[in-house]
Structure formats: C-alpha cells, structure tokens
Amino acid sequence: MTLYIRREASKLWRRFCSEITTEIGLLAENWKYLLAGLLCQYIHGLAARGVHYIHRPGPTLQDSGFFVLPELGQDKGFISETVFTCVFLSFFLWTFHPFIVKSKKIYTVLIWCRVLAFLVACQFLRVITFYSTQLPGPNYHCREGSELARLPRPHNVLEVLLLNFPRGVIYGCGDLIFSSHMIFTLVFVRTYQKYGSKRFIKLLGWVIAILQSLLIIASRKHYTVDVVVAWYTVNLVVFFLDKKLPELPDRTTALLPVISKDRTKEESHKLLNGNGVDPADRRPRAQVNGKDSNGGHTDNATNGT
C-alpha cells in the first residue's frame, strides 16, 4: 500500500512539474493580457465606486419580479452571496485542475485570458449603462433614510482609489443595470459549458445561474431588468467574442502549444544545421511494383542489373 502511494505521489509530482513548466512558458507570452484584464477589473470597481457618489435614493421602482418573488429580508441577503462565492471558487479551482488531473482539455493561462476578455467586454457595457441613468437602488442600504445611500465628498484621492475595500464594494449603490454578479456567473457557466467534461456539472451550472438570478431579485439587490439584461447581454457578448478570439489548443493530443520564442529557436536551429527541409519529405516512400522508390538504385546495384 505504501509503495502504491509513493508511486502515485511521484507521478502526481512529475505531472505537476511538467504543467508548471508549460504554464510558465504560456505566462511569459501572455502576461500582458492577464495584467490588462486584472487592471480592467480594478477600473470597473473604480467606476462602480464613482457612481455611488452621484446616487440619490428614492422610492423603489415598480418591478414585476418583486411582485412574484417574496422578499427574503435583510437578514437573508447572505444567501445569494454564498451561492456566488461557491460558483466563483468552484470555477477558479477548476481552471487549475490540469496541474493534478491526468485528463485535461485546457491550459490555465489561456483559459483565464479568454475569461477576462469576456468579463472586460461585458463590464465595459455595464459601466456605460449605469452611468447613463442612475436608478434609486432597491437594496436596503440604498433606500431613503440609510446612512450608506449617499456617500459624502471624498477627503482625498486615496479614499476613491482604494475603493474603501471591502466595505465600499459590498455596500455599493447606483451600479444597477446590469448585474455584475450575473456577468461573472454566466461567463463562468458558459466557459465550463464549452471546455468542461462533466455533463452533470454543465446542467448544474445553468440551474445555479437561474437560482442565482431569483435570489438576487428576492434579496432586492437588483431590479428584475438588471438580471434580464445581464442574461441576454452576457450571452450575446460571449457568443460573438468567442468567434473572434483564437481557439484554445486541443489538449487531447500529445502536442503542446508552440511558444513564439521556441518556434524561432527551432527554425534557427534547423537553418544552422542545414535541416531546413521538412522532415515529412524524408519519410520512406511507398513501394511501387515491389520496388522502393527511394532505394531503387541501391536495389538495382545489389541485384547486379
């Protein structure tokens, strides 16, 4: 038993080291895209913080979802946040499964480049939308009479740039259309739908996305229109952007993605060694009439003809 555990642990460690080497090479080539995506996440948070300064509380708007779904109450608002946290952590961990699982379809660096591209495109549209029209927030801390509904003028620039994290992120107001939680949820679900392998988890992801939508409305964190707009906007953005982005390499084959630096080195090595001919041109030719086309002269010499 101990020998089996050691052997499996050794295999796992070799697989982990091999994956680390591959991912470091991909990171060296794609780090600027990841950095730009993370920077845009901060800019999105900065925009959401900025709209809170101009938010003005008022009567909650008439909403069909509020009539259909009973109000959960302020003490149960954590339920939707818990569901979202589970979705986020599950997807995050899944993107790192190639480091330990033998069967894999994705590269961690490349999948996050793709996911961040989807998120940034959706968040760009979201910022334009909630700055175009400021609606009175339906959340409890955004209603009239709440001290958090209006933000006082900032005392310094750092107060704005630091976003008053994490309190300023949790108790934001004014960034309504469309739901940021639904952007992340739908992007994650659609990504797993394409690159995941478990059919049950794919179905479960869509069920959780629907449940998350209902919980957001029942918690009065967003109007129904915020959730509805998120559903068709995110799906359309991902659909069209997915066709424009280069497809991920297929990991079902034994070939690794060729990094441009390695490709240049390989081509230079071939030229220096006089191996510029495609190796495919050197493969043995098929026999014709019982004679090898490459070795025709040799065979003739051997036979004395």
Swiss-Prot record:
Top-level taxon in the UniProt lineage: Eukaryota
Catalytic-site annotation from UniProt: 181, 222, 226
Compositionally biased spans, kind Polar residues: 290-305
A GO BP entry: sphingolipid biosynthetic process
Topology in the lipid bilayer: Multi-pass membrane protein
PANTHER family the record matches: PHOSPHATIDYLINOSITOL:CERAMIDE INOSITOLPHOSPHOTRANSFERASE 1-RELATED (PTHR21290:SF62), SPHINGOMYELIN SYNTHETASE (PTHR21290)
Protein name per Swiss-Prot or TrEMBL: Phosphatidylinositol:ceramide inositolphosphotransferase 1
Species per Swiss-Prot/TrEMBL record: Arabidopsis thaliana
Lineage, uppermost ranks: Eukaryota, Viridiplantae, Streptophyta, Embryophyta, Tracheophyta
